[in-house]
C-alpha cells in the first residue's frame, strides 16, 4: 500500500503515546515490514512521542502533539511535533558517556537513531519536529536472506 497518509492531533497524554505507537505498528505492517522491523519502528515512535509529551509539552493540556505517518512506497515517513520550548539536538547528552550510563532516562534519541534509517530534527515556533524514516527493503537487501 503506497501513498497512504494518516495524521492526528493528540493531547499531551500517555494515551496519545499509545495511539501513536499502535498506528506506527499498523502502518509498518501495511508497508510490508517484517515483525522485528515493525517492533523497532513502533519503539522509535513511542520514544519520540514520549519525548514530545513529557519533555516538549510537559503534559500541558493546552499543548498538542501532531503525528503523521506516510507510506511513500519506498519508505515509511513519520513526523512527530510538539508545542514546547524546542530542543537543541547538540544539548542532548551522550547516553554512552560513563557519567550517563546508570541514569534512568536519556536514551530515547539514541534508540530512535538505532532503529530508524534517518532521523531529522527541525525547530518550530513553538516546538520541535522530529521526522523518522525507515526505508522499505526488498528481500535482496537482507544479507541473511541471500544465504538461505
Roles of regions detected by a PLM:
Residues 12, 43, 123:
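Conserved strand-loop elements at the edges of beta-sheets that form or border functional pockets
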Residues 7-19:
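STAS-typified acidic loop motif
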Residues 22-46, 101-104:
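Conserved short strand/loop->alpha-helix "switch" segment adjacent to the catalytic nucleotide/phosphoryl-transfer site
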Residues 47, 51:
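Conserved polar catalytic motif of the HATPase_c/GHKL fold
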Amino acid at each position: 500500500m503506497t501513498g497512504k497518509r494518516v495524521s492526528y492531533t493528540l493531547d499531551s497524554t500517555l494515551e496519545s503515546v499509545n495511539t501513536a505507537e499502535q498506528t506506527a505498528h499498523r502502518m509498518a505492517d501495511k508497508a510490508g515490514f517484517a515483525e522485528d522491523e515493525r517492533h523497532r519502528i513502533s519503539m522509535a515512535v513511542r520514544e519520540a512521542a514520549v519525548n514530545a509529551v513529557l519533555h516538549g509539552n510537559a503534559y500541558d493540556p493546552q499543548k498538542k502533539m501532531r503525528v503523521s505517518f506516510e507510506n511513500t512506497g519506498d519508505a515509511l515517513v513519520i513526523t512527530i511535533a510538539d508545542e514546547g520550548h524546542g530542543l537543541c539536538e547538540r544539548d542532548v547528552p551522550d547516553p554512552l558517556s560513563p557519567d550517563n550510563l546508570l541514569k534512568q532516562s536519556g536514551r530515547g534519541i539514541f534508540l530512535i537513531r538505532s532503529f530508524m534509517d534517518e532521523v531529522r530534527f527541525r525547530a518550530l515556533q513553538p516546538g520541535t519536529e522530529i521526522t523518522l524514516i525507515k526505508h522499505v527493503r526488498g528481500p535482496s537487501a537482507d544479507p541473511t536472506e541471500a544465504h538461505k
